[in-house]
């Protein structure tokens, strides 16, 4: 089977690698345009651009897929299917219907749950116990297409965004090859609109920790929002990021946000339910610190109430 691959970030890397190693033939790659990344105007290509170039696969970086020139270019490729993995551009109807088997997409959630831009993050933030990777036949909606294959799995305890991201990418890579191997015979299963939800893009407005939530809820937020946009609390008008934490299931009658220091090196904060031990923190413009390093260099008193 001849394949056009469309993808840009690290999430798409395992899929392109698996397709190249398979019996199928990736004949072209479409990815995001190279960007100026720093003050020296150095050009940074996407991870997929770098990989495709290393594999000697032709690479195309259009600003849009809506122009006649780009659509005519794609039409000239003798491809059977287009595989999409976190590409970043809207794929118009003309391209969705262009090839024999259309466009298929790798989506890291248990569709129809968590359609949209941030399914992995929202899965963790909302405390889900299991998730999935789905291969869907793309239509004009946002992740609304019929499901071709779906692989469910349980989330490891305390899993963070980067770990689940990599796990979903690897599962999706194997699954998309299987989908193409059996694309002639696999049924297309419509999604239930009644159970649909949308995983909105993360916002910095969500970053501030609310100590009146449970320790479990806050821990899920910390794990799901690291590295971006991160989570923080305020002390003496300083926004301090929390990069890693641990739930301590001790009951208390303290005001949420109250600081307790155990054994001179453990930083505990009372939440609505239980405590959260802050394991890794970061001051503005500084490197990551363990809790004992933080307590050595930053003055925070027991019984302080954090904002």
UniProtKB/Swiss-Prot annotation:
InterPro entries: Fmt, Formyl_trans_C, Formyl_trans_C_sf, Formyl_transf_N, Formyl_transf_N_sf, Formyl_transferase-like_C_sf, Met-tRNA-FMT_C, Met-tRNA-FMT_N
Name this polypeptide is given: Methionyl-tRNA formyltransferase
GO molecular function, one term: methionyl-tRNA formyltransferase activity
Species of origin: Orientia tsutsugamushi (strain Boryong)
Enzyme class: transferase
Catalytic activity: L-methionyl-tRNA(fMet) + (6R)-10-formyltetrahydrofolate = N-formyl-L-methionyl-tRNA(fMet) + (6S)-5,6,7,8-tetrahydrofolate + H(+)
Gene coding for it: fmt
Family note: Belongs to the Fmt family.
Short name of one Pfam family: Formyl_trans_C
């Amino acid at each position: 089977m001849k394949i056009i691959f469309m993808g840009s970030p690290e999430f798409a890397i395992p899929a392109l690698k698996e397709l190249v190693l398979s019996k199928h033939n990736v004949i072209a790659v479409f990815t995001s345009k190279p960007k100026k990344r720093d003050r020296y105007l150095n050009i940074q290509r996407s991870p997929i651009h770098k990989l495709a170039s290393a594999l000697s696969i032709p690479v195309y970086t259009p600003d849009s897929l809506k122009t006649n020139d780009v659509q005519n270019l794609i039409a000239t490729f003798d491809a059977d299917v287009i595989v999409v993995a976190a590409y970043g551009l809207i794929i118009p109807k003309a391209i969705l219907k262009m090839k024999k088997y259309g466009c298929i997409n790798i989506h890291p959630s248990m569709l129809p749950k968590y359609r949209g831009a941030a399914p992995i993050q929202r899965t963790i933030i909302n405390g889900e116990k299991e998730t999935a990777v789905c291969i869907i036949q793309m239509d004009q909606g946002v992740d609304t297409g019929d499901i071709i294959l779906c692989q469910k799995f349980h989330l490891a305890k305390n899993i963070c965004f980067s770990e689940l991201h990599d796990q979903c990418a690897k599962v999706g890579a194997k699954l998309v090859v299987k989908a193409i191997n059996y694309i002639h015979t696999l049924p297309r299963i419509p999604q239930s609109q009644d159970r649909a939800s949308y995983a909105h893009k993360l916002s910095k407005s969500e970053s501030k920790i609310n100590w009146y939530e449970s320790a479990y809820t806050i821990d899920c937020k910390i794990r799901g929002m690291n590295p971006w946009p991160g989570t923080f609390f305020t002390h003496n008008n300083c926004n301090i990021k929390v990069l890693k934490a641990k739930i301590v299931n001790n009951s208390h009658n303290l005001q949420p946000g109250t600081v307790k220091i155990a054994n001179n090196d453990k930083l505990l904060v009372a939440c609505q339910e239980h405590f959260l031990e802050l394991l890794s923190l970061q001051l503005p413009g500084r490197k990551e610190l363990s809790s004992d390093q933080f307590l050595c260099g930053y003055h925070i008193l027991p019984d302080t109430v954090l904002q």
